[in-house]
């Protein structure tokens, strides 16, 4: 284990492991994503840490269910992280 570490230029892996407030530049862990329904192929915008069950607008199937942290996507759903 090296004693000398560059604190001003940490590696990307080190920064991702840190708590969101202890990073060099603070950034949230949550994001919005576009989820495609496997039945009707409609796209719905969902928060990554959704706290309620999200249903499809077209066919009323469950797209994701809440857990303690991130929402769990239903099997067959595909998603894309939205750019801010």
Curated annotation (Swiss-Prot):
The record places its C4-type zinc fingers at 37-59
Gene Ontology CC entries for this record: cytosolic small ribosomal subunit; nucleus
Compositional bias of kind Basic and acidic residues: 1-16
Residue pairs linked by disulfide bridges in the UniProt entry: none
Keyword terms: Metal-binding, Ribonucleoprotein, Ribosomal protein, Zinc, Zinc-finger
Q: How is the cofactor bound?
A: Binds 1 zinc ion per subunit.
Q: Which organism is it from?
A: Rattus norvegicus
Q: Which cofactor does it need?
A: Zn(2+)
Could you tell me in which tissues this protein is expressed? Expressed predominantly in the striatum, hypothalamus, heart and liver and at lower levels in the cerebellum, hippocampus and pons.
| Lineage summary | Eukaryota, Metazoa, Chordata, Craniata, Vertebrata
Where on the tree of life does the source sit, at the highest rank? Answer: Eukaryota
Q: Which GO terms describe its molecular function?
A: RNA binding; structural constituent of ribosome; translation activator activity; zinc ion binding
Give the protein family: Belongs to the eukaryotic ribosomal protein eS27 family.
Query: What are the start and end residues of every segment in region (Disordered)?
Result: 1-23
Name of the gene this protein is made from? Rps27l
Name the InterPro entries for this protein.
Answer: Ribosomal_eS27 (IPR000592), Ribosomal_eS27_Zn-bd_dom_sf (IPR023407), Ribosomal_zn-bd (IPR011332)
Q: Name one GO biological process term.
A: intrinsic apoptotic signaling pathway in response to DNA damage by p53 class mediator
**Protein's name according to its UniProt entry:** Small ribosomal subunit protein eS27-like
